[in-house]
Structure formats: C-alpha cells, structure tokens
C-alpha cells in the first residue's frame, strides 16, 4: 500500500511539473501525502525520513529567500570560473540573427498551430518571372558547352544582367526586383537544375555581397550610388572574405586597413590604407564592385569614438589603384567565375566603409546576419535541385533500363537507393520551404539557416551518389547527354562554401542554438559576465523550474512513448506525437549538457555535433509534417512524408542515445538514457516494405513527382538530357497496357525486336498500329540509355564533339 501511495505521489509531482502548476499545489499535496503515509499507511521509517527531508528541504528552498539567494550566489561564483571567454567576434556571431521554429524543438514545445499557419506563396509577378525570364535563361544554357568554354556565353551574361537576375533582392525603389525569399529560392533552384555554373553566378550577388549588405546597412548615399547599377547589371559585385590563412575561421583574417590621414590634392582626407590577400572569391575575375572584409586598426585614435577597431566591411571599385584582380580558380572543374584579389598600400576614403564610419568594427555581425539570409536560400536551393534531379532521372532510368530481362527498379538493391533518394528529396524540399518562410517573415534565422544549408547539401551529396550508383555506366561517361556529372562535381563546392559543413555541425549549430534558443542561458551568461548578482538570482530560479519542467515532460513522454500527447488530427497523428516526445527528451538533454559541461561543450565538438543532429533532424521532421499537411489528400504524399519523418526520428534518437553513451560521466549518461529512453532505440530506420512502395512510386507518375517537376527546368524538347529521360518514361507509362499485353516483350533484344513484333502481328496478337507504337517507345528507350562517344580526332583536338546522335538506332 505504501508503495502504491508513493507512486501516486510521484505521478502527482510529475503532473505539477509537467503542467507548470503553482508550487503551492505541490506543497499542499506533499503535506497530505506525508500525513497519510506516516500516520495511516505505516511507511517504513528509512524511506519515510528521506522523503520528509526532501520535501522539507524543497519547501525551504521555495519559501526562504535567504536560502535561495545563498544557492544562487554559490552557482554564480561557480559559473564565473567556468564560462568560456568569448572574443568579440565569437560574441557577435552567437548573438547575430533570429530564432525560428528550431526554438520550439530546443525548448520541447512544438507549436502545431503556428506550424500550420506558415505559408510561402509566390506573387503573380514572381511566378511570371520564374515561368518566363528564368525559363528563357535556362533555354539558353548548355552545361556541356559551358564546361568546354570555361565560361557562360556573352549572350547569357548579357541576358542575366539586362533582365535583373543580379537584382532579385534589391528593393524596387532602387531598380531591383524586390522579390521574396521564396521567389529567390525558386529561381536559383530552377537555374541550378539546368546549370550549376549559372546558378552560382546568379545566386552570389543576391546572397552575401555588396547588394545585400548595402540594402541592410548602407547609408542612403551609398544605396543611391550603387544599388541602381547593381540592379541593372551595370556593376558586377563580389565579396572578398576568405584568405589563405582564414577559411572557416574567417575571424582571423590578416587583410587589414589602417586608419590614417592623407593629403589628396589640396585636402587632407581621413581614410584607410588597405593591404589584402584574398582567395576563393566568386565573381572576382569579372567583378567591377568589390566588397571587402578587413581587420581595421586605428593606432592614432583618428576614429575618435565613431566606430571602433575590428572586422569592417568596405566597398571599392575594381579600378582602385594597386588592386590586383583577375586570376581564376577552377573549383572542382566547375567553371564559374572564382579567383583571387590582392593588393598593398591601397588608399581609400573612410566613406568606403559600408554604412559609414559608425559601422567601423561591426563587420562581423553584419556578415553573419546577411550570411544567415543567404544560407537560408541559395545553397539549400542548390541541394534541393540536385536531389530533385536525382529523384526524377533515377526513377525514370530505373523504369527504362532493363537488365536480366527485368526493369532494374525491381531489384531490391536498387529499391533501397531509390527510396533513400525519394525520402531525402522530400526532406530537402520541405526543409528549404520552411526555412525560406522565416526570411519571408523578415527574420534572419542564423541557426535554422545553418541546419538547412548543412543538411540540404549533405542530402544532395547522398542522393547524387545514389543516382550515380543506379545509373552506373550511364552516369560516368561525360558529355552533352550526361545530366548527373555536373551535379556530382559541384557537390563538394556547396559542402564547403558559406561555412564548411564539418564546422557547422560540430561547432556552429548547437553553439549558436544554445545561446539563441534557450530562454535563459544568454541572459545568465551576460549576468555573470557583468557581475550582476541580482539579475542572476532571478534568472537561475526560472531556469531551474524550466529544467524540472522539461525533466517531467521527458520522463513522462519517454515512459508512455508519447501516446498521451495532444496532436493535430491527421493521418500522421502518431508522427506528431513522436516529434513532440523526442523534442521533450531533447530539451532536457540539451539543458543538462549545458549545466553539466558548461564551457567544455565548446571543446567537446562531437558531443555538440550529436546535439546539433538531434535538433536538426527534429526540425526537418517538423518541416516534413508541414509539407504533408498542405498535400495530405494525396496518398503518395503520405508515403513520402512517412519515410522522411521515420528517417528523422531514427537519426534524432540515435544521436541522443549516442550522446548519452559518450557523456563524460558514464553513470550520469546511463541514468539519463534510462530516464529518457527506457526502452532503448525504439525509432527505427524506414523498413523494406516502405522502401519498396516508395521506390515503385518513383517509377510512375504521382502527385509529389508532378509537383517537383514544376520546380526544375524541363524544356519539352526530347533532345535535351533530362527531357529525354522524361519523354521515354512517359511513353512507357502511357503504353503500359501494350507491355502487359505482350508479356514476353522484355526478353526481346533491340536488334531482333522488329522481326519478333512482325511475327506477332502475323499471328494476330498485335495490330500494325500497336507494333508501330511499341517500336516508337522502344526507340525512345534505346535513345535514353545511350552515352556520349567522341571521335578519336576530336578528343585529340579537345573539341569533344559527341557523335552519338549520328549513330544508327537498331529500331530504325
């Protein structure tokens, strides 16, 4: 009886914490329990004493201010010795940007209503630009010719400039398009599906660069001077940040600007003496307006309090004296314009600082905030484009290509690759749109953008690798027919730029997330830094109650598998519950790690990476549920969403369990694992049955497939590489009844097909029209699986003219 009563009391205590009820309710309930247990039930004296001590001690802490102050002062002193010392640039990076729905994950409180109300819809003007100007640009592009010429054609360059592709995000009052983040993302994605080189060329001026920096931070004079020319393409911008000694650690740049006065003509001008050595700068070889990050120094104190020393952003023209620019890099054989900028003793006026002298020393925060916008849009769109191409072409190829008298998509090994392509593509598109929605709401989602950039580019890598595996020889022979090699070569570039993925996962995502998303940590950090005990006293007790609240949620959800959690009415209701259940566990685990490890988390990168994985996968699961919610009337969308969220739950739980196993305190790690995940790894990788259904779905028309076809470039011309595959697939789908009618057709070889079909016509098994139709379909199938070949002489001359189209078709 005593044990049962104790369990009831424990459930009551957890309910008070879970529901955040008034502590007085717990105190009254505890008093009633202790009286009954002690005087009426006959509780054993030893546990009785322990429970009395715990309850009395807790009440004293809750009610006696002097005790609370003593505890908080003790914690204040301990934290003062353990918090990491941050440099100015680290502090600016951690404080830059806004939070988005990742905060719901971090705090264990997903808001389903808020999620359901998020919308990103193109305006009529934006849709028209995607359908017309962007389509026309894609018509003009030929990735094979671009690779041979190592540049876009003059015609393409002029079209990009004249039609405002460099001014997509510049406000209309300065001659730009003023498009939304969704339009920007859709435009980049469509171009990327045709040419990665062209996509990079368009996306960089609209991402981290002079246009974005001027729009947000420029003076009115700077905006009026530069933005109209940028919008019209009269100026081509670039931004020079990285250096030989400063890549991911961009805060350690050595390029410097010394504040000094110099006599120019009859006037003494306050200016900067700039020396720089930059590399990996996209558009640098052709740029006419150069944005530049330098370490500003003021040894003579000439700034006089207006601005300060530190990283500063400048804007200088190409023809500035002593500036060396024009040399090119060739990143992964992708011939977009990328190169070096050097110079020494370059004098520029102080007015070249973006935003004027007052912004001296504030460049890093400007860069991080603008980077969070670009990382939300450009690179996620590239990753989504790659995985979408993988989805459409690999599904089609698996239906078109036959081996061992069977469509290769029927082999289980191929099905496994297909399902992963489909599920990860669904995740990439869903995550892209959810993060873009934050920018549409004028937020600068630094954490969400880092997660989206990391995982969309990683998913691009996985799906393209899978596509290469399935296509096999069809993918490895380069030429104008090959639609995968360019994506494959471009993947390392997207993985590396705007924050190398290794650094983002191990340092940035959870590092920024803990400061931005936790309701108390940032304020506690500053209270300790400023020696503000009074502020800390108020914060720490709110934090402790928050910690206990999350503990109760994590414990209850873990032991009930989340079955009691409220969730929206949906065919995927159980997935909503699982997401909430895992977010409850994550919130307490993240908080515990911050409390126990403190500043050591900055050094324990692999633990930080696992916490980053947990938050990221749950964020992507949330994105997938939202994406499904908008299309839930279609059964094929459910299959895609089911695979995507199942994958995310598996990876998130795996990351958290791995975190517990590798926790520095083994006993505490074990205890946490038992409390939060008493049944171990209950979330599993998508099963074979789901893989099979999804793979088979990829090889035929479905609602999701039809939707993503609208997001990439298709010309309607069966001579174009991707259209060639799509044309053959649609013929196979539309005439599937004929293949079912002639069941042994798959055993026919191309060379003997006409003869064998003629025999069947003679027997009355086929009509002549049906025979002609089948031959037309098989001719398209033959054409789709051909690869490029080149004459020996053209290879020798490096002209690389494919002769495949001139070769006879065995069905002619």
Please give the residue ranges for each predicted region.
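Gly/Pro-rich turn-and-neighbor structural signature
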Residues: 120-135, 141-163, 214-263, 273, ...
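Glycine-rich phosphate/cofactor-binding loops in nucleotide/flavin-utilizing enzymes
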Residues: 475-572, 667-758
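C-terminal substrate/ligand-recognition segments
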Residues: 575, 579-582, 605-621
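A short core secondary-structure module
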Residues: 267-324
């Amino acid at each position: 009886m005593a044990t049962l009563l104790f369990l009831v009391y424990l459930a009551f205590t957890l309910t008070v914490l879970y529901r955040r009820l008034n502590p007085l309710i717990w105190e009254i309930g505890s008093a009633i329990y202790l009286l009954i247990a002690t005087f009426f039930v006959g509780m054993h004296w030893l546990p009785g004493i322990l429970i009395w001590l715990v309850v009395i001690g807790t009440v004293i802490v809750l009610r006696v201010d002097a005790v609370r102050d003593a505890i908080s002062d003790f914690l204040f002193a301990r934290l003062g010795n353990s918090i990491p010392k941050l440099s100015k640039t680290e502090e600016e990076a951690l404080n830059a940007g806004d939070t988005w729905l990742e905060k719901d994950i971090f705090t264990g409180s997903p808001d389903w209503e808020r999620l359901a109300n998020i919308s990103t819809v193109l305006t009529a003007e934006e849709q028209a630009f995607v359908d017309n100007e962007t389509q026309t640009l894609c018509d003009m592009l030929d990735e094979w010719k671009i690779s041979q010429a190592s540049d876009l054609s003059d015609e393409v360059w002029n079209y990009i400039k004249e039609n405002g592709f460099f001014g997509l995000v510049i406000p209309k009052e300065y001659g730009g398009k003023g498009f939304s983040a969704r339009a920007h993302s859709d435009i980049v994605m469509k171009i990327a599906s045709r040419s990665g080189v062209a996509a990079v060329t368009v996306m960089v001026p609209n991402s981290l660069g002079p246009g974005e920096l001027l729009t947000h931070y420029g003076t009115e004079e700077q905006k009026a001077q530069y933005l109209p020319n940028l919008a019209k393409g009269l100026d081509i911008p670039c931004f020079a940040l990285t250096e030989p000694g400063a890549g991911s650690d961009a805060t350690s740049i050595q390029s410097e600007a010394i504040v000094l006065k110099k006599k120019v003509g009859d006037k003494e001008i306050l200016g900067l003496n700039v020396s720089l050595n930059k590399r990996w700068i996209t558009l640098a070889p052709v740029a006419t307006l150069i944005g530049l990050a330098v370490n500003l120094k003021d040894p003579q104190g000439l700034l006089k309090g207006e601005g300060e020393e530190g990283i500063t952003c400048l804007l200088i023209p190409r023809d500035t004296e002593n500036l060396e620019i024009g040399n090119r890099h060739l990143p992964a054989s992708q011939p977009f314009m990328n190169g070096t900028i050097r110079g020494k003793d370059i004098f520029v006026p102080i007015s070249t600082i973006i935003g004027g002298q007052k912004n001296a020393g504030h460049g890093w925060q400007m860069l991080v905030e603008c980077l969070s916008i670009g990382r939300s849009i450009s690179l996620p769109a590239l990753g989504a484009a790659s995985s979408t191409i993988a989805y459409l072409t690999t599904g089609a190829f698996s239906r078109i290509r036959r081996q061992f008298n069977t469509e290769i998509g029927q082999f289980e090994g191929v099905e496994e690759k297909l399902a992963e392509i489909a599920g990860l593509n669904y995740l990439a598109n869903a995550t892209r749109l959810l993060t873009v929605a934050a920018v549409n709401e004028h937020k600068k989602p630094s954490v969400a953008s880092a997660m989206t950039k990391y995982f969309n580019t990683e998913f691009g890598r996985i799906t393209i690798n899978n596509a290469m595996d399935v296509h096999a020889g069809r993918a490895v022979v380069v030429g104008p027919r090959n639609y995968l090699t360019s994506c494959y070569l471009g993947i390392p570039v997207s993985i590396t730029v705007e924050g190398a993925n290794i650094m983002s996962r191990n340092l940035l995502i959870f590092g920024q997330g803990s400061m931005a998303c936790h309701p108390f940590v940032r304020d506690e950090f500053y209270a300790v830094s400023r020696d503000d005990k009074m502020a800390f006293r108020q914060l720490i007790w709110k934090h402790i109650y928050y910690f206990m609240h999350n503990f109760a949620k994590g414990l209850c959800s873990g032991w009930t598998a989340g079955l009691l959690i409220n969730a929206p009415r949906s065919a995927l209701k159980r997935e909503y519950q699982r997401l909430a259940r895992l977010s409850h566990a994550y919130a307490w685990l993240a908080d515990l790690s911050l409390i126990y490890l403190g500043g050591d988390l900055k050094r324990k990168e692999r633990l930080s990476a696992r916490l980053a994985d947990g938050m990221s996968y749950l964020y992507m699961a949330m994105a997938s549920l939202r994406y499904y919610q908008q299309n839930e009337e279609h059964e094929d969308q459910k299959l895609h969403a089911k695979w995507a969220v199942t994958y995310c739950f598996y990876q998130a739980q795996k990351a958290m369990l791995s975190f517990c196993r590798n926790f520095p305190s083994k006993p505490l790690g074990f205890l946490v694992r038992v409390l939060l995940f008493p049944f171990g790894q209950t979330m599993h990788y998508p099963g074979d049955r789901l893989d099979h259904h999804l793979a088979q779905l990829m090889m035929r028309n479905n609602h999701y497939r039809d939707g993503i076809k609208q997001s990439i470039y298709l010309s309607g011309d069966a001579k174009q590489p991707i259209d060639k595959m799509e044309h053959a697939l649609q013929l196979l789908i539309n005439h599937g009844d004929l293949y079912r009618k002639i069941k042994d057709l798959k055993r026919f070889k191309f060379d003997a097909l006409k003869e064998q079909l003629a025999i069947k016509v003679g027997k009355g098994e086929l009509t002549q029209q049906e025979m002609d139709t089948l031959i037309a379909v098989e001719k398209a199938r033959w054409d789709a699986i051909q690869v490029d070949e080149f004459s020996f002489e053209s290879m020798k001359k490096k002209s690389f003219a494919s002769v495949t189209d001139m070769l006879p078709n065995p069905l002619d």
